[in-house]
Amino acid sequence: MARVKGGVVSRKRRKRILKLAKGYYGAKHILFRTAKEQVMNSYYYAYRDRRQKKRDFRKLWITRINAAARLNGLSYSQLMHGLKLAEIEVNRKMLADLAVNDAAAFTALADAAKAKLGK
């Protein structure tokens, strides 16, 4: 039986990894072993940061809502509690958008929350 040489398969495998590593800095897009390590790390970072992004945006929204709430004489937690008591269901993304782009609407929501809190 003839000996099977894996040249074609190996070259295809290496080319696939090096293609994925295109644009990486230094030897990481040239040398197969370092490119392979970097591609594996890149997949790990992408997986991790897709989840981290959700947390980061929520933090950003809360920060923006808190800043706008304090301009209206409430803390973030007081505003959220007041909105819940007033049975106003607005998610944090929409509240943050209102805080940045439509201050009058946000003030109206803050006033409704204040009324329910008795302030």
Curated annotation (Swiss-Prot):
The gene is rplT. GO terms for molecular function: rRNA binding; structural constituent of ribosome. It holds the Pfam family Ribosomal_L20. This is Large ribosomal subunit protein bL20. Keywords: Ribonucleoprotein, Ribosomal protein, RNA-binding, rRNA-binding. The keyword Ion transport does not apply. The lineage of its organism: Bacteria, Bacillati, Bacillota, Bacilli, Lactobacillales. It comes from the Bacteria. Transmembrane segments: none annotated. SUPFAM superfamilies: Ribosomal protein L20. One of its GO terms (biological process) is translation. Binds directly to 23S ribosomal RNA and is necessary for the in vitro assembly process of the 50S ribosomal subunit. It is not involved in the protein synthesizing functions of that subunit. Belongs to the bacterial ribosomal protein bL20 family. Signal peptide: none annotated. Gene3D superfamilies: 6.10.160.10, Ribosomal protein L20 (1.10.1900.20). GO terms for cellular component: ribonucleoprotein complex; ribosome. CDD domains: Ribosomal_L20. HAMAP family: Ribosomal_bL20.
